[in-house]
From Swiss-Prot:
It is an enzyme of class 3 (hydrolase). SUPFAM superfamilies: (Phosphotyrosine protein) phosphatases II (SSF52799). Residues 196-354 form the Tyrosine-protein phosphatase domain. This is Tyrosine-protein phosphatase cdc-14. Residues 463-479, 526-541 have a biased composition (Low complexity).
Length: 709
């Protein structure tokens, strides 16, 4: 008989342990983890991982999740690695969250359950229903619902089950594929200074903030001009721009660049009319390429119309749409827009015959009619009673009764109904009613406030980081800590891949091919080769350089240092923003780490100890000026050298030459079209030869003789 090493529930503390994978993975909630009996045999064979303070959600107001797509990916990869390592040691893994007295326990708890449920769906083949039952089976206190990013009391609470069903539908329709996902790229483009956009349906619908006529910074938020997005949109085949807010830029800037532009304005914080919704659905249906949708912040109005098209095209429910939207772009769909989507759910389904909803709806309606006809004589007008059998088939109220605390005193409990029910759409004695369409005292609309909050939180996250010392381990072992590896990837079987470095300092999957560039000289940054070989996945260097200029850039260090050629492949992918733009002039990252200095030594054969990267200066004989504009070249050609990069490696460079050199001047030729480099002083020139012909008459012969002598 096999010995059961499952961690037992300790009677000395109030906790719950939920078995997700038999004898492998558990989910726990510990009010006091120090009370665990470490001498217990089952505890010694268990690896405890504290999820508190590992990831942080940047709220707009009182919203707290779900955690975005990058956090979901990193946690799933880490869980897979932990299970693989601990299974070889016959140890179990318990991911737990604890009540640290900060009031965030319920929020962290439901976010952890969401990530573990998504892991079961993505990697273990669970359905969303089974995954939800797994994570909630051992919980005595039900999960709270996710609220929106509005200022007032929530009008709707998003159910954990709806979020998991949104993940399941995204996996089904190909929107989610962690075997080809770049979380660093996702986090880069999500930042306000780098464009502030996210793919909702990869390759089809992109959500971004509203551009302005010119790039500027206002109230801490950087606004972008339309031309900032041109390169990225062209590279990712975005052909149509839909504007939902007031005109803050000239639409001709997009149309002159070859994009289609559509205006569908409605008030910030409000819901669209049926006419606007139908026009938007028609625009998306008739567009062959991608559609970039924006309002002011790209959250409320943008997410609402995108959800309407998703319900029409794929037959998703309103809750599933909101769940997936907030995973991709946190803060989407706000205030009254939530009950609006629930109200328009069946209407959106009826707009398409290909979403698979109609056949099920018709059969269900006929079945209900027959049932009503057969039971019409048994209708009871008295008090409604639910039989135990029918109660098993109904969805339980999974959200607990919360007690509002004001001034240290508990008031009447407020029942929070599960999302998707009529009770959840009715606010029970709201403490604060806010009109999301109204302007505040400073004249800011909902979008203005959200933009400033997002910029503020992202700026604060740069200066503060989670306390890594808060992670608690109860059993000493060599198991890796709960830190996200920068070199973790997944293959097509959704298994983590660890790229091991070789003796020469590069990864085992190093490729010798050149960097692929776009026609304008930018680097195409990919993740997979065309053959699907995942061993060529790029290893993270840790020295990526982020820079904002006149376009959207994402520059890996391999583009700055030629010896670290990128191992990104040439296959087009659509699971995240896929073609980052590289600036025309390389920008360097000042680094003082030993690995950075070691790489500089390997790049500089002379052994320079300076941390400033050097550049090769060619010998320039003449610089021609032409009227036509040519795209700048990435590498300046050396006189007398071939195009092969191998010849450049043989050049020994000690230090860059100053240009122009000492004693050299640049003179414009008579034709006015070119420059010549000449010495500063002409040799063998008679003194006074350069004076004017009438100098003697002006100065006098005596003075001139004295001057020349």
């Amino acid at each position: 008989m096999r010995e059961d090493h499952s961690p037992r529930r300790n009677n000395t503390i109030e906790n719950t342990l939920t078995e997700l994978l038999p004898n492998r993975l558990y989910f726990g909630c510990f009010p006091n983890p120090d009370a665990i009996d470490k001498s217990d045999k089952s505890v010694k064979k268990t690896c405890f991982i504290n999820i508190n303070n590992k990831f942080h959600y940047e709220p707009f107001y009182e919203d707290f999740g779900p955690w975005n797509l990058s956090v979901l990916y990193r946690l799933c990869v880490q869980v897979g690695k932990l299970l693989e390592v601990e299974e070889k040691r016959s140890r179990r893994v318990v991911l737990f969250c604890q009540d640290d007295g900060t009031g965030q326990y319920d929020k962290i708890r439901v976010n952890t359950a969401y990530v573990l449920g998504a892991y079961l769906i993505i990697y273990q083949g669970f359905s969303a229903d089974d995954a939800y039952l797994k994570v909630s089976s051992g919980e005595t206190v039900k999960f709270v619902g996710f609220r929106d990013a509005s200022m007032g009391s929530p009008q709707y609470l998003l159910h954990l089950h709806d979020v998991l069903r949104g993940i399941e539908k995204a996996l089904k329709f190909g929107w989610l594929d962690f075997s080809d996902f770049d979380y660093e790229e996702y986090e880069f483009y999500e930042r306000v200074e780098n464009g502030d956009f996210n793919w909702i349906i990869p390759g089809k619908i992109l959500s971004f903030c509203g551009p302005h006529n010119e790039s500027r910074e206002e109230n801490g938020y950087p606004y972008h001009a339309p031309d900032v997005y041109f390169d990225y949109f062209r590279e990712n085949k975005v052909s149509t721009i839909v504007r939902l807010n007031a005109k803050n830029y000239d639409a001709s800037k997009f149309t002159k660049a070859g994009f289609d532009h559509v205006d569908l304005f409605f008030i910030d914080g409000s819901t669209p009319s049926d006419e606007i919704m139908l026009k938007f659905i028609k625009v998306v249906d008739n567009t062959k390429g991608g559609v970039a949708v924006h309002c002011k912040a790209g959250l409320g109005r943008t997410g609402t119309l995108i959800a309407c098209w998703m319900m029409k095209e794929y037959g998703l429910t309103a809750g599933e749409c909101m769940g997936w939207l907030r995973v991709c772009r946190p803060g989407s769909v706000i205030g009254p827009q939530q009950p609006y989507l629930i109200e328009k759910q069946k209407f959106c389904w009826s707009l398409s015959q290909s979403n698979g909803v109609h056949l099920t709806q018709n059969k269900e309606e006929k079945r209900n009619v027959r049932r009503l006809v057969n039971q019409v004589d048994d209708i009871n007008l008295g008090e409604e009673r639910i039989s135990p059998k029918s109660r098993e088939n109904t969805r339980p109220n999974i959200l607990r009764r919360r007690v509002q605390v004001q001034n240290g005193r508990s008031t009447a409990p407020v029942t929070i109904a599960p999302a998707g029910t009529s009770e959840s759409r009715r606010s029970t004695k709201p403490s604060r009613v806010v009109d999301e369409t109204a302007l505040d005292d400073q004249g800011r609309s909902q979008g203005d406030r959200l933009l400033q909050l997002k910029a503020k939180h992202q700026h604060e996250s740069e200066t503060t980081s989670p306390n890594s010392s808060s992670s608690r381990r109860f059993v000493k072992s060599s198991t890796p800590q709960m830190t996200v590896p920068s070199q973790a990837y997944l293959n097509r079987n959704r298994e983590p891949i660890i790229v091991t470095p070789s003796k020469n300092g590069t990864s085992s999957g190093t490729s010798s091919r050149q960097l692929k560039t776009t026609p304008n000289g930018n680097v195409a940054y990919r993740t997979r080769n065309s053959s699907g070989n995942t061993t060529s996945t790029l290893t993270r260097t840790g020295n990526e350089s982020y820079r904002f200029h006149n376009s959207l850039f994402y520059e890996p260090a391999s583009a700055v240092f030629p010896s670290m050629a990128s191992r990104r492949s040439e296959t087009t992918r659509y699971l995240s923003p896929t073609t980052p733009i590289k600036p025309m002039s390389p920008s360097y990252t000042d680094g003082t780490s030993p690995r950075y200095k070691a790489r500089l030594r390997s790049e500089n054969p002379i052994g320079s100890t300076t941390s400033t990267p050097f550049s090769l200066q060619p010998q320039i004989t003449k610089c021609s000026l032409t009227a036509e504009s040519k795209p700048p070249k990435r590498i300046l050609s050396m006189p007398g050298t071939s195009k092969s990069t191998s010849s450049l490696k043989k050049i020994q460079v000690s230090r860059p030459r100053p240009y122009p050199s000492t004693g050299v001047r640049v003179e414009l030729c008579a034709n006015g079209k070119s420059y010549d480099i000449r010495p500063r002083k002409e040799a063998h020139v008679i003194p006074g030869a350069g004076l004017a012909a009438n100098t003697e008459a002006l100065l006098g012969v005596c003075k001139l003789v004295n001057t020349l002598s």
